Structure formats: C-alpha cells, structure tokens
A protein has these predicted regions:
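Conserved C-terminal alpha-helix-loop-beta "cap" of PLP-dependent enzymes
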Residues: 3, 285-366
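Regular secondary-structure segments
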Residues: 36-40, 261-264
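Generic N-terminal amphipathic, Lys/Arg-enriched alpha-helix
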Residues: 11-21, 30-39, 309-315
Length: 380
C-alpha cells in the first residue's frame, strides 16, 4: 500500500505536464537518495547556499546563482534586490518603501498571474505596449528615475517573448543601466535555455527546479549578476528580510543541485527519444474512424508553452458520431482510479508524455478505448 493509499488520496497519471497543481515532477532516485543523506546532519545554511550557488553557476555559465523556494520566490527576491541592493537599511524598510525607486517595466503581452510576485516587495509594475505586442520605444518611453528593472517573461517559441526579443530588451537595459529580470520557470526543455538565456546578458534569470529538471517541486533557482545574487542572498533565509518566509531546507538545496548535475544533454536526449516512442504508440493505438491522432508540437495559441520542440499526441474526436464530447471523455478520465489528467479544448485532448511513468501510456490507451467503446454502444 502506497503512502497515498494510506492517506486516501487518489493517484494521478499525469499526461498534462509539469504542473504545480499535480506535483510538478517525479524526482530522480539519485535526488531522493541525496536528500535522505542531507537530512542526517546539520550544516551552516549560508555555506551550503554559497557552495550550491557556485555549482549551479558553473553548470549554467552564470556569474552566480542562488537556490529559492520555487521560481515565484525567485521573482520576489529579484525585485527586492533590484530595489535595495544589499543595503541593510533599505532592505529592512521593505514593505515600507516611501521614497524608494520601485518601478518595474513589463511588456503587457507578458503579463500573467506570476508577474504579481514581482510586486510583493511593493514594486510598482508599469505595463507597456498591448497584449499583442510592444516596441523598443514603448519600453524606453516608460523609463523614469524610479525605474529599477525591466521584467521579461520568456517563452521559447512565442514571438515577442523569445530569445530574439529578449536580446533587444537586454540591449535597452544595458543602454540605460537597468537590470533585466527574466522569468523562465518552465522553459526547460530545450536544455539550451539553461545557459542560453543568461548568455544574452540578462541580469537575473529564474528557473523552476521541480519541473523538467526533476528536483524538489518546491525549489527554484536564480542565476545572473554576482552583485544582484549577493543582494538576493542577503534578503533570503536565514536573514530577517523579505525572503525570510521563503525558506529552503538543506534537503531541498542538495536535491536541486543533484538534479541539475544529472540534467545533461545526453540524459535529456534519451528522454526525448522515449517521449517520441510514446507519441507514436498513442498514434498507433488510438487512431480510428472517429478519432484522428496527430503528432503535434506545443502551440502557444493554446497556452502550451512548456517543453517547446518536443512532441505530443493530439486526439481530435468526432463527437457527433461517437456520441460523446472531448470534455466528457476528459471528465471520465479524471474520475477514474487512477485519475488521468490531460489538457482538453474544443473537440481535442492532448497527451503529453513528459511526466508519464513506465507503462502508464498503456493504461491511458486502455481507458480511452473503454470510454469511447461504451459511448459508441450507448449511441446505438
């Protein structure tokens, strides 16, 4: 009996992706082993953070790095660091910031609920452009003597949010001496982003540690300029500033470092090949007269941003002839035991192999076939 059985919690087969609401990812055995080992002794937490930061900086090609309690916490700390540096007097004044420089410029098309984290230290978010785009002039015209940073939400394959757009924004930041904060939480894979984003000259880049890297789900890390990382560390636990509630345990720090050390191009490529095999399995097993199954890439128009360039299987259901809608199929998948979670829109269900465990693709196929077969009988 698993721990979830004992707790009365239904297990989920995750055909959606690295969603926090589903637990992020499954940690590698090596990560779990390292965390168990870390739990057996005390350490100086500042020393551990410093050593972990050096390892992460070497892996990513950044000047410095810091482990956070998720990518959202990294954004909070990044904003605070840009507002105060490592000046203890200024740090202690957050959130009472009267007289502070506190404006962060954000392209309106980048705005999303995660951007609120930038405002937690009482930063003022100044949106520029429209939801459809922005220009260099939009950003430059918004710069004032209160501007402390420019925020950029990175998406690998979305125009205006991609590497080309980031390089232009970084150029503006350098021209005006303003740091650029990049939210790249779920932008792995492709693994090239791990080094490529900070290589643009972006001052701070935040990643999740609990998504494709498969570290603890409640970890993240931020990489970039050494002086700003120093300020982030000053704000963070165990110090009594804005980062105090965002505590990262010794086990989490160790787990993230080990996960990153195993996140190599070779390991990622091996997973990509397996991913492709699963997609082809779905196409072979689920294609029928009334179900078209396509190999597709993530579509930003459908808010599919993570794992860019990696395939998925999209089921297009003939709802009229089958007598069941895609939404009804999806509901039945979730109601089963184990529950199966996959994104659905209109007459389509998308199966993402990213988080599937060995053999789960067979369970998904069996369940979908059973649901569709029963629906067809009911129509008759």
């Amino acid at each position: 009996m698993s721990i979830y059985d004992k707790l009365g919690v239904k297990r989920v087969i995750n055909a959606w992706g690295t969603l926090t609401s589903l637990g992020g990812s499954i940690m590698l055995p090596e990560v779990i082993e390292a965390m168990n080992d870390a739990a057996k002794a005390f350490v100086n937490m500042e020393e551990l953070q410093e050593k972990a930061g050096k390892i992460i900086a070497e892996i990513t090609g950044a000047e410095a790095a810091y482990v956070t309690s998720g990518a959202a916490a990294a954004l909070v700390l990044a904003a605070a660091a840009c507002m105060t540096g490592d000046d203890p007097e200024k740090m202690a004044r957050i959130p009472y910031i009267e007289g502070f420089k506190n404006e962060i410029i954000l392209p309106a098309m980048h705005d999303n609920p995660y951007c609120r984290n930038l405002a937690i230290p009482c930063a003022k978010i100044v949106k520029v452009g429209t939801k459809d785009g922005y220009s260099k002039e939009d950003i430059e015209n918004a710069i004032t003597d209160k501007t402390v940073a420019i925020a950029f939400v990175f998406f690998t394959s979305k125009k205006g949010c991609d590497m080309e757009a980031l390089k232009e924004v970084v150029e503006i930041g350098k021209k005006h001496g303003i740091p650029v904060i990049v939210d790249a939480a779920a932008e792995l894979p492709p693994i090239e982003n791990l080094r490529g984003i900070v290589a643009t000259g972006a001052d701070l880049v935040a990643f999740s540690g609990g998504k494709d890297i498969r570290g603890p789900n409640d970890t993240g890390f931020i990489i970039g300029r050494a002086d700003l990382i120093k300020a982030i560390a000053a704000h963070g636990n165990p110090h009594h500033y804005i980062g105090r509630p965002m505590k990262v345990s010794k086990e989490q720090i160790v787990g993230l470092v080990v996960a990153l050390q195993h996140y190599t191009p070779e390991a990622v490529e091996m997973r990509r090949r397996k991913w492709e095999e699963i997609v082809q399995f779905f196409i072979k097993e689920l294609s029928s007269k009334y179900v078209k199954v396509e190999r597709v890439m993530p579509d930003p128009a459908k808010h599919e941003y993570s794992a860019q360039g990696w395939p998925r299987a999209r089921l297009i259901i003939d709802e009229e002839n089958l007598g069941i809608t895609a939404a009804e199929v999806n509901k039945l998948l979730r109601e089963g035991n184990p529950a199966i979670y996959a994104p659905q829109s209109d007459n389509q269900i998308t199966l993402n192999p990213q988080c599937l465990q060995d053999g789960e693709e067979k369970i998904i196929v069996q369940r979908i076939k059973s649901i569709l077969s029963q629906a067809k009988k009911d129509v008759k």
